[in-house]
Amino acid sequence: MNSPADYDPKPRRASVAVDVGGVIVGGGAPVVVQSMTNTDTADIDATVRQVAALFQAGSEMVRITVDRDESAAAVPKIRERLLRLGMDVPLIGDFHYIGHKLLADHPACAEALAKYRINPGNVGFKDKKDKQFGEIVEMAIRYDKPVRIGVNWGSLDQELLTTLMDRNKEQGFPLSARQVTREAIVQSALISAELAEEIGLPRNRIILSAKVSQVQDLIAVYSMLSERSNHALHLGLTEAGMGSKGIVASSAAMGYVLQHGIGDTIRVSLTPEPNGDRTREVQVAQELLQVMGFRQFIPVVAACPGCGRTTSTVFQELAQNIQNDIRKNMPIWREKYPGVEALNVAVMGCIVNGPGESKHADIGISLPGTGESPAAPVFIDGEKALTLRGPNIAADFEALVIDYIEKRFGQKDAAE
């Protein structure tokens, strides 16, 4: 019979720590949230605005496309503008096809970036592949930059895949085509990492990723990678899709591997709605890590889903208002109230679970359900503190939450 401890998250996989512009990835460090812009990098103003928005939303690293000379020339200017805004966010250069040439032709770009992303599937073809891969690695060594060797199933090394498919055929097809493709993805990452180390890039300068678009494939390839190397791993489900589908797919895939101790940095690759908010992917990544108990980014507002006992919408509106206020104020609160991200607030809709849930929160309210007395007990630190009545219950509770934050988390400032 298993013990209760057997159902806890698996210990974090031991991986080599990599310093990316001052942010540590792997080596037992907290799982890092990152994101990517969708602006034309050559448009400096637009890119600075989006990087700033992603950074303020909580992205700890931001990847930008470097696809041509104009983009490469813009990178140091983008970096300089961000620093003037007080945003020392590591910028990751996303290179495909001609990264070796762009880094050589634009040394200021090579210096400004905190990390280079290399795709082994399109860094070069046939006899040029290893040569051009090596040139990027040599640039990373010259400028003391880490690289992410990012394999993607959509641009997988076809020579390697063909070799493995042929071998599988010779052996009588013991593996399905899907299983062979997974093996090719893993081998592409490991072979490339081995080549980078042979050239002279140390392991503490290498991060691996193996992006796929199906949940089961992600679970498989990262499980395989984790067993066969100790490189820091970047998790992400590529082409996850839009809206709830993308959120569910990314959460299901990454949640499983994170629970098994695998993963050192994550990106949730959501397709935004037209003119949608790019920062949504950062919020989802943070929420995934927070609900799994791996990190704390923002106070939690627990609220019941509602039922026939809660025909009023007051508790829903109150929970939403508090959550919105928290998100709006977190950039200030994070500095003013250290530790506030650990706060738990409960907004419950009736007597069934309301008092119990509110007692478990730092501060909670149990609003009256249908037919209940129009009174709302408030619990603070597990004890009933007072009862709110009248038409201003919501506003009164919001004021109590602010007062609680100031008293509990503002003490450190007051003592200094």
From Swiss-Prot:
Named cofactor requirement(s): [4Fe-4S] cluster
Q: Which GO terms describe its molecular function?
A: 4 iron, 4 sulfur cluster binding; 4-hydroxy-3-methylbut-2-en-1-yl diphosphate synthase activity (ferredoxin); 4-hydroxy-3-methylbut-2-enyl-diphosphate synthase activity (flavodoxin); iron ion binding
Record-listed [4Fe-4S] cluster binding positions? C304, C307, C350, E357
Q: Which reaction is recorded as catalysed by this protein?
A: (2E)-4-hydroxy-3-methylbut-2-enyl diphosphate + oxidized [flavodoxin] + H2O + 2 H(+) = 2-C-methyl-D-erythritol 2,4-cyclic diphosphate + reduced [flavodoxin]
Give the record's cofactor note, including how many are bound: Binds 1 [4Fe-4S] cluster.
Q: Which InterPro entries does the UniProt entry name for this protein?
A: Dihydropteroate_synth-like_sf (IPR011005), IspG_bac (IPR016425), IspG_bac-typ (IPR004588), NO2/SO3_Rdtase_4Fe4S_sf (IPR045854)
What pathway does this protein act in?
Isoprenoid biosynthesis; isopentenyl diphosphate biosynthesis via DXP pathway; isopentenyl diphosphate from 1-deoxy-D-xylulose 5-phosphate: step 5/6
Keyword line? 4Fe-4S, Iron, Iron-sulfur, Isoprene biosynthesis, Metal-binding, Oxidoreductase
User: Which GO biological process entries does UniProt record here?
Assistant: isopentenyl diphosphate biosynthetic process, methylerythritol 4-phosphate pathway; terpenoid biosynthetic process
Q: What is its EC number?
A: 1.17.7.3
NCBIfam families associated with the record: ispG_gcpE, PRK00366.1
- Record family assignment: Belongs to the IspG family.
Q: PANTHER family from the xrefs? A: 4-HYDROXY-3-METHYLBUT-2-EN-1-YL DIPHOSPHATE SYNTHASE, 4-HYDROXY-3-METHYLBUT-2-EN-1-YL DIPHOSPHATE SYNTHASE (FERREDOXIN), CHLOROPLASTIC
| Protein name stated in the entry | 4-hydroxy-3-methylbut-2-en-1-yl diphosphate synthase (flavodoxin)
Q: Which organism is it from?
A: Agrobacterium fabrum (strain C58 / ATCC 33970)
